[in-house]
Amino acid sequence: HTAVLAKGVSSIMGTTSSASTSGRLSPFAALRYRDFRLLWLGQLVSTAGTQMRIVAVNVQVYELAKRGGAIDPALALGLIGLARAVPLVATALLSGLVADRADRRLLLLLTSIGALISSAVLAAASGLVVTPLWLVYAMVILAAVVGAFEMPARQALVPTLVPPEILPNALSLNIIAWQLATIAGPTLAGLLIAWAGVAPVYWI
């Protein structure tokens, strides 16, 4: 009985010690892991770029619709929102399945290439005398599809980069990265568009 009691006390003390250690984790503990740090920085830059592109597309579509006169500018902006939302909903189940079964690093690479193609086409098109609205919508749809696959792949990769006890911290840092990018992206886009137009935003 004494041995069992001692074992139980030891187990409790070990659990308490572990919890205490966990409670003293640095707010940036997950960033000590190189692979997660690279993923986190990539997410910060990628999300900021996405937010910048959203602002640039909205400005470009509004100006094109206003100049062309074939469609009301407010309606044109509403259709942009639809072009972003429909692919996200349509691919929701498929993107989750692919993220679970595919090589997540390869999937992130492919989605990055897709996003680059979308931005490059928009940047090149913005230099045309008349940019077709349909082309802008097509690239918005491509970017939305890419984003639908990128998000679950990135989330599924996180648990493989840090120990289980660090995972809550890693997820919290991901939220912080998203919030920072959501604030900084539109601000930078607005400043850059006011200074040099929409094309430079697409190239960033």
Protein language model annotation of sequence segments:
Residues L5-I204:
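Alpha-helical transmembrane-bundle signature of multi-pass membrane transport and export proteins
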